[in-house]
Amino acid sequence: MKRVGLIGWRGMVGSVLMQRMLEERDFDLIEPVFFTTSNVGGQGPEVGKDIAPLKDAYSIDELKTLDVILTCQGGDYTSEVFPKLREAGWQGYWIDAASSLRMEDDAVIVLDPVNRKVIDQALDAGTRNYIGGNCTVSLMLMALGGLFDAGLVEWMSAMTYQAASGAGAQNMRELLKQMGAAHASVADDLANPASAILDIDRKVAETLRSEAFPTEHFGAPLGGSLIPWIDKELPNGQSREEWKAQAETNKILARFKNPIPVDGICVRVGAMRCHSQALTIKLNKDVPLTDIEGLISQHNPWVKLVPNHREVSVRELTPAAVTGTLSVPVGRLRKLNMGSQYLGAFTVGDQLLWGAAEPLRRMLRILLER
């Protein structure tokens, strides 16, 4: 039975990962060893079997005893510990939610419903580093994997509507505080049916712009507004989040020689934990819409084709409908006015499940089954 070290299991992604591992009985198949950065010797989580007290996540000697390390501790931890561990001669498998190693030549970005062949080839070749992808990229590929598999995508534009969870737990809390502050500023007016909506709107706008409005984490109002920039600014005018779309899509698909152009604008919106994306796909040939729907819907068990009608789209193609589920609905599928090779689509997915935790959990299972 493989000794598997879990690090960062208390954080947001780590907690979702733990919940999924319990649901799928993954702990039955491993000898779990839990690590901490702050509570060495403390009590580990309840996973249905005896576990040792918490070990020091910075102890190279402890980490070296493991067959697999599964970390959701973040990029700073990876940058500090990973090189020391490899230098110490550790030959185990490193599975990581953080982006630090994502684009390294000796790392594979894992999304097995899309790139299982790439993963298997890497395992056969002795690759030891398996990294979770960017959440929007993973969710887009889960939705449109069928089109990429069929070699139909010439280029793609992704305009995103990204949830607060992508920025972290404190940001989710801040979004709710912002919503609460906006509501509190006009609660009395809302209770009075005779109050004028333009007066209410003016008061809300004043609240959003006030110094007292809680923006410590986002740096700007998100509740009742949006933020048209995610991550660092790059010299070419892209945000780093936008750069990831093409870089990671092609790395996941192992398209190093002839990359598919992917670009767009990434926007933070007031959703809690589901990212949505409006996609424009340039096909390299004219394919009937019914064939496209078949390719998409048959690609993996989680993608869900939503018919392009108003009622079902409003009901099923939203963050509220999808949050907390592994379902990746894709809808609004239609040929665009630009021509028969231009396809429009809209997709939604849980940023913490297929966007983060689930590909890591499944990578562990792939290792255990070998």
From Swiss-Prot:
InterPro entries, per database record: Asp-semialdehyde_DH_CS, Asp_ADH_gamma-type, Asp_semialdehyde_DH, NAD(P)-bd_dom_sf, Semialdehyde_DH_NAD-bd, Semialdhyde_DH_dimer_dom
Residues that bind NADP(+): R10, G11, M12, V13, T37, S38, Q73, S165, G166, P193, Q351
UniProt keyword list: Amino-acid biosynthesis, Diaminopimelate biosynthesis, Lysine biosynthesis, Methionine biosynthesis, NADP, Oxidoreductase, Threonine biosynthesis
PROSITE patterns per UniProt: ASD
Biological-process GO terms, alphabetical: 'de novo' L-methionine biosynthetic process; diaminopimelate biosynthetic process; isoleucine biosynthetic process; lysine biosynthetic process via diaminopimelate; threonine biosynthetic process
Cleaved signal peptide residues: none
PANTHER family per the UniProt record, alphabetical: ASPARTATE-SEMIALDEHYDE DEHYDROGENASE, DEHYDROGENASE, PUTATIVE-RELATED
Protein name as annotated: Aspartate-semialdehyde dehydrogenase
Gene: asd
